[in-house]
Amino acid sequence: MAKTSYALLLLDILLTFNVAKAIELRFVPDPPTLNITEKTIKINASDTLQITCRGRQILEWSTPHNRTSSETRLTISDCSGDGLFCSTLTLSKAVANETGEYRCFYKSLPKEDGKTSVAVYVFIQDYRTPFVRIAQDYDVVFIREGEQVVIPCLVSVEDLNVTLYTKYPVKELSTDGKEVIWDSRRGFILPSRVVSYAGVVYCQTTIRNETFQSSPYIVAVVGYKIYDLTLSPQHERLTVGERLILNCTAHTELNVGIDFQWTFPHEKRSVNGSMSTSRYKTSSNKKKLWNSLELSNTLTVENVTLNDTGEYICTASSGQMQKIAQASLIVYEKPFIALSDQLWQTVEAKAGDAEAKILVKYYAYPEPAVRWYKNDQLIVLRDEYRMKFYRGVHLTIYGVTEKDAGNYTVVMTNKITKEEQRRTFQLVVNDLPRIFEKDVSLDRDVHMYGSSPTLTCTASGGSSPVTIKWQWMPREDCPVRFLPKSDTRMAKCDKWREMSNNTGKNPLISQTSVDERTLKTISTLKIQKAVDHALYRCIATNKMGQDQRVIVFQVTRFLNLSVLPSSSPIEGQDVIMRCVADRLLYYNLRWYRVANVANHDPPPAAVPCDTLTLSHLHQPNVTVSGLQGTNVTLDMPIPNATMMDQGLYACQVEIVGTNEKTCLLHNLRLRALEMSRIVTNLTDQRVNVSDSTTLVCEVSGTPTPTIVWTKDNQTVMEGSGVILKRSNRVLTIQRVKKEDSGLYICTACNQQGCESSEARISVDGAEEKMNVELIMPIGAVVIAMFLWLLIVFVIRNRKRPNDGDLKTGYLSIILDSDDMPMDEHCERLTYDASKWEFPRDRLKLGEPLGRGAFGQVVEATAYGIEKATTCTTVAVKMLKEGATSSEYRALMSELKILIHIGHHLNVVNLLGACTKQGGPLMVIVEYCKHGNLSSYLKSKRGEYSPYKKRTPRMPNRREVQQDEDPREGDLGLGTSTRLDICTGTAVCTRTGEQTYKTLQDEQESSDWDHLTMEDLISYSFQVAKGMEFLASRKCIHRDLAARNILLSENSVVKICDFGLARDVYKDPDYVRKGDARLPLKWMAPETIFDRVYTTQSDVWSFGVLLWEIFSLGASPYPGVCIDESFCRRLKEGTRMRAPDYATPEIYQTMLDCWLDRPLDRPTFTQLVEHLGNLLQASAQQDGKDYIPLTNGEMEEELVAPHLNVTSKRSFYAGNTEAQLHYDNAPPLGFPQQMNSSGVPVNMTGFVDIPLEHTTVMDGHVDCGVGLSREQMKALDRQAQRPLNFSPLLRCKSKESLASESSNQTSGYQSGYHSDDAEAPIYANEEMILKRDIRKKPPLPKRNDKFSAEVRYSAPPV
């Protein structure tokens, strides 16, 4: 019976297959056609729909009538005739729910649209029922993750604006045409993830202000797949009493529930994943990943016994799918460790093997701690090391070499019992013998006759010892006359002889030695006298095999053959073949053509002539020369050489005395003439103004073609900005200008002809045009002033600080790390090479400016780094040799930070960088010629005057009229100032007056010879301005001090910190605290105690910087020991007294910066406004105004390189000495115990304790150091302190009134108010500055002798 059923089943399968093939091969008729040609038609509700279908076979219809009871209204009638099948569908009184697809198809064939069926989509329009209702109240839409979903809310009216809504939660999903797509025939099509969270969705439309909703659709996300099931650990070992923890984890689809079942070895039964007994506990956990679920069940068995040993099985079931995972457990009675009994084992390997394994047979629980030793030296594994631990114990050595041989010892220690076991393995590395000289020696050794050379063979075979023996062969026994070049030729020379001292013509001595340390065998063969040619062979042998080296020993006298004019002459040249020999050894030189040897390249150097077939040459022009001296020369000229002259030539010489003939061979090869040809044609280029472009014209030809470039039929010559390289093959145009546009032609010519290629260069963008007509006048002025400039330069250098004090650098700041870590900040910052990259070949390094632990800063000259100049002095920061990758990344991060900060006048700005491979990383910043502010102030101590000195000159009528001209602005200033940001040079010019350079030099010569109070306030104001900019860029400096402020030309100060250029271990300003060195004198209390760096801690440092400025570079806290007591007193409220040259307003500003609470300190914006008012007042007393730059002005002028700001160095015209008038100028003294809020405070100053052993170092007084001589004199001169500038001035100009108004309404005031502010103005109160005011004024004399103490009445909160 079973056999019959099987046969019937097989027969049925065969019939089905044949029928299917018959259907495939059967003729398919033409598709049916409808009387309606449109794909979509529209009718109104209650209308009658009639569709006629014609075809070649029996027809049937499919309709959406199942949504309604349309049996009585839907009829299908046969209309066949004329040989075609015909069927008519009639639907009367159509309703909206019958909207859909009406398809006509062949009854006996599968439905294929356009082949066996045809359809039309009918909209039955009913504006009262715009949505096609489903039969039930709701429908379920099943979705799967990652698939498209169709929400089938069909409409009866095609052109409706339909919106999809989710109900839980309520949300509108608008149609965007990309993810959410509306199709009036299908509904909404969208990804499943868009509605996977929604419980219910529905469609909605509005018709004539009436809203209609479709039936609701329930969204059901289904899933059942279990991707994987893991049980960890798979192999567990424990001792009695320990705890077993097994974690069964399944990764599934979303919305999948898992039932976990556990099977134990000793119970042989399954328990569910939620059971809990005294020893067995399970816990479940669920974790949703981004596209799956992670379901886990953890089994915990307390106090395992020996009976718990066995297999544990975890079964996970989702209903439709099930997976099983298992793990094994071995329970031991107690910890142990056991190694194999063999104490010494030998492991052999071969050099060059991929790996060598030293396997350790052991059995232990728990896993022991393993240490490996090689020759009693501990092996430390590293990632890049070739040794690895396999499974934590076995040692694997990759890429075996001879150096790996040795004794390896493994030491295993039980982590619980501390029991220790060790075994030693000897690794022997065998290798085939290798003769080292074969790697570097030539095929032949040529020695002078009578010399005593030594032949050496050095061989090694790894751990296998090597023996070396020598053999020799006379040249008569080698049938190959030419010197051997390959092993195939050497195979013919097999008559080797053993060595003996009395055989052959070359007496010799043999010696062999072994180097025990390197396992190398060295054998030498000493030739006592080189007499005749011979072959020598050394053979190295060990148990792995052998190696040999053949030395072709050639004895020669002076012979040489050369070809002129070059070793590779060209067809058509006049060639000379020259043979040179020692005339004391050779004579009768003759040239021959060799006939029996062809195409031997290269030929041997010298062979016996009797082995060659020589043909005589007609030599009428052969000349013998050089008979004087020891050499004789035979020249054979070949005029106008042709290809027929190619071949092997021999110069025959005869040896004096023996008449033996030796031939020197040379294979003459000529290079055929070839017409010039351009290999790659030029292509048109479009470049931007100031970019560089390169045209490459690769040519070939013999002789080498000459290349000429032309532009618009004019020859291109190399010059400024135009570079020709590689014999004119490469044309480079630097800093392209508009006039560089044109047609460039490369023409290559030689004797055979010429060829050219052309390309058109188009230049886009506008360029900065320089008035060429001004070049000649400016050049004449510069030349005429050269001597005067040289004098000024010498004077400046005399008063410049030492080179050791020049610490020029860049900004070493940090980003505010509240948002993310510093490393992540730097990773996110980008470097735009197209904007900042500067070629290294246009950078000329000069003298070093600073040097630190791992970096250095050098002065350099950059060519073309700025548009307006061709040569700029810059500072370049670079790493020292041997810098690590982390130091490279640190410098690269600081480069990115500088780019992120941007440009500002009072910050050392970035100019470019060199980051490309092929050279060191270099960061290019501005160069500040006057060095750091601290050193500069110290150098100017003897040249300080609180007031401005003026050189009187007679004003002319035109100048007076210009000064009074009201058209020159509200400020009444007839000068305009331009400040070049990059070069730091400023110029004040009047229309029709002096030129840029003249005014600049006059200005510097008159104003830079001494310091004034206005200078000090200006420095402070500019630093505050720069810090305000840094604060706006969320940057914290952390080391704001005078040493990190650089002074450029025209009194422009720039904030910097050459971190790598300063070695903090050698700087006395940095005090060791733990493992770090910190500038404690400049640090705020919260930074010292809590390591908190904020912008307000920079404000504290700014206050200390003010103290440095107004003490002319003195070290803060003079005479105070910087230790824990200093930090404690600082926290208790003790502050420094006013410096010698500070006004009350300035000192009060310092105290405000030193307030205990960071939030009570002024911001840099407030400090800018306050110091700007003080600077304005000081400038007005000097007869002019100083207008601080605003942020808007700064940003605008950073685009254009000239800043429209009134320079603090302006000219004063008068017929008498400069007179300064003061209104209500109070005497300089301490503030009247007022803080920034006007609240009286009691502050303690640091008490100076003079000690016996004092040392003064550059004005710096540290622990155990007393006051300097200047400071002692200052105490006696305090009473003679000069009057101060008052910030509340009564000025007669309206700009002065504006300044006063600004001063009164400032958002931040110093807290000082003069008691004489309302006193009457004394017109006769004035001070005339004398010419001899260059000497330092007397320091103020204080009555309190530094004993006055001020303390806070209550500590700040």
UniProtKB/Swiss-Prot annotation:
Polar residues bias spans: 1298-1312
Superkingdom of source: Eukaryota
Localisation per UniProt entry: Cell membrane; Cytoplasm; Nucleus; Cytoplasmic vesicle
InterPro entries, sorted: Ig-like_dom (IPR007110), Ig-like_dom_sf (IPR036179), Ig-like_fold (IPR013783), Ig_I-set (IPR013098), Ig_sub (IPR003599), Ig_sub2 (IPR003598), Kinase-like_dom_sf (IPR011009), Prot_kinase_dom (IPR000719)
Gene3D superfamilies xref list: Immunoglobulins (2.60.40.10), Phosphorylase Kinase, domain 1 (3.30.200.20), Transferase(Phosphotransferase) domain 1 (1.10.510.10)
Transmembrane region(s): 775-795
Catalytic residues as annotated in Swiss-Prot or TrEMBL: D1039 (proton acceptor)
Entry-linked Pfam families: I-set (PF07679), Ig_3 (PF13927), PK_Tyr_Ser-Thr (PF07714), VEGFR-1-like_Ig-like (PF21339), VEGFR-2_TMD (PF17988), VEGFR1-3_N_Ig-like (PF22854)
Topology of this chain in the membrane: Single-pass type I membrane protein
Catalysed transformations (reactions): L-tyrosyl-[protein] + ATP = O-phospho-L-tyrosyl-[protein] + ADP + H(+)
Glycosylation sites: 35, 44, 66, 97, 161, 209, 247, 272, 303, 307, 407, 501, 560, 621, 631, 640, 681, 688, 713
Disulfide bonds: C53-C104, C153-C203, C248-C314, C457-C538, C579-C651, C697-C746
Family according to the record: Belongs to the protein kinase superfamily. Tyr protein kinase family. CSF-1/PDGF receptor subfamily.
Protein name as catalogued: Vascular endothelial growth factor receptor 2
Lineage, uppermost ranks: Eukaryota, Metazoa, Chordata, Craniata, Vertebrata
Name of the gene this protein is made from: kdr
